[in-house]
């Protein structure tokens, strides 16, 4: 077994405390009863116990649980997706009420089988949550929806509080990590979102540990800022299974702190960086920080 394919042992700083209190079990039961999915479970997020048990937050995953893409880092199931569930937006909105969320993140599997990439259901979910939860801030995390401008406009017209779209990795590694998504297309998606709704903060995320260099990461930060992205999250890539891309490096907390300082020096309004940081980690704090800085500028 070569160093490139070795299933590396996680360092101490990546070990997490499991907490399965009544908040955790209650949320799990509610999701099952409403036939809803969360990216927390489907993508095997390491923060699920903190978010569900302590912070009582969750990221809803709409448009089913089967993705039409097969990115080599992702644990979400791939294959032929299910039919659209047109009642899903209302069930998500009802769940936000039941959970008493102040901030909700709505993401989705990629639906390349749909002409609009799922934009209509995405937009209706935003509107449904807004109707039933007028004081809840809403963050959306869509795929690139095929790079079709009309699809993005449909979503942005629903006026989410924050638009999040992840480039996932650096330019040099993008084709290997997510072959059916394109680095430049993601940058264009983020740029267009800001052009359509200048007052809505935009956000993106990068995983580290896939073989990128410091120079690669700085280039990616510059690319995001050149396309007016406001918020950046940086987290450690964790190999979901031996079928996925291997971890080539575990970044220590101190290196994440350095990367955060670099990101802030580039002009990002907020940067969340750490071994266990994921795109939706402390999302409520990120959107609040971005809005405060926008209001003060």
Curated annotation (Swiss-Prot):
Keywords: 4Fe-4S, Cytoplasm, Iron, Iron-sulfur, Metal-binding, S-adenosyl-L-methionine, Transferase. Its EC number is 2.8.1.8. Its cofactor is [4Fe-4S] cluster. Pfam families: LIAS_N, Radical_SAM. It comes from the Bacteria. Pathway: Protein modification; protein lipoylation via endogenous pathway; protein N(6)-(lipoyl)lysine from octanoyl-[acyl-carrier-protein]. One of its GO terms (molecular function) is metal ion binding. It catalyses: [[Fe-S] cluster scaffold protein carrying a second [4Fe-4S](2+) cluster] + N(6)-octanoyl-L-lysyl-[protein] + 2 oxidized [2Fe-2S]-[ferredoxin] + 2 S-adenosyl-L-methionine + 4 H(+) = [[Fe-S] cluster scaffold protein] + N(6)-[(R)-dihydrolipoyl]-L-lysyl-[protein] + 4 Fe(3+) + 2 hydrogen sulfide + 2 5'-deoxyadenosine + 2 L-methionine + 2 reduced [2Fe-2S]-[ferredoxin]. [4Fe-4S] cluster 1 binds at residues 40, 45, 51, 280. Residues 53-269 form the Radical SAM core domain. It is found in: Cytoplasm. [4Fe-4S] cluster 2 binds at residues 67, 71, 74. The keyword Cell inner membrane does not apply. GO terms for cellular component: cytoplasm. Belongs to the radical SAM superfamily. Lipoyl synthase family. This is Lipoyl synthase. It comes from Bacillus cereus (strain ATCC 14579 / DSM 31 / CCUG 7414 / JCM 2152 / NBRC 15305 / NCIMB 9373 / NCTC 2599 / NRRL B-3711).
């Amino acid at each position: 077994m070569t160093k490139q394919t070795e299933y590396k042992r996680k360092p101490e700083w990546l070990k997490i405390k499991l907490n399965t209190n009544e908040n955790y079990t209650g949320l799990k039961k509610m999701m099952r009863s409403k036939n809803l999915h969360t990216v927390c479970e489907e993508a095997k997020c390491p923060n699920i116990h903190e978010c569900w048990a302590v912070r009582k937050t969750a990221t809803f995953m709409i448009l089913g649980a089967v993705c039409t893409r097969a990115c080599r880092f992702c644990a979400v199931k791939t294959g032929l997706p299910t039919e659209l569930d047109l009642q899903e937006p209302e069930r998500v909105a009802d769940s936000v009420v039941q959970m008493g969320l102040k901030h909700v993140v709505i993401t989705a599997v990629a639906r390349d089988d749909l002409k609009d990439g799922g934009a209509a259901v995405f937009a209706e979910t935003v509107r449904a949550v807004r109707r039933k939860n007028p004081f809840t801030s809403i963050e959306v995390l869509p795929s690139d929806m095929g790079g079709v401008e009309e699809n993005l406009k449909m979503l942005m017209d629903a006026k989410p509080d924050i638009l999040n779209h992840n480039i996932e990795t650096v330019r040099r590694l993008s084709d290997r990590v997510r072959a059916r998504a394109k680095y430049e297309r993601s940058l264009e998606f983020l740029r267009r979102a800001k052009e359509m709704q200048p007052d809505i903060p935009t956000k993106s995320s990068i995983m580290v540990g896939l073989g990128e260099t410091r120079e690669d990461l700085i280039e990616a930060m510059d690319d995001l800022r050149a396309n007016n992205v406001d918020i950046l999250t940086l987290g450690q890539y964790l190999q979901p299974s031996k079928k996925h891309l291997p971890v080539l490096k575990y970044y220590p907390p101190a290196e994440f702190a350095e990367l955060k300082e670099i990101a802030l020096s580039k002009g990002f309004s907020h940067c969340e960086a750490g071994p266990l940081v994921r795109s939706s980690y402390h999302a409520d704090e990120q959107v609040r920080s971005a809005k405060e800085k926008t209001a003060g500028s």
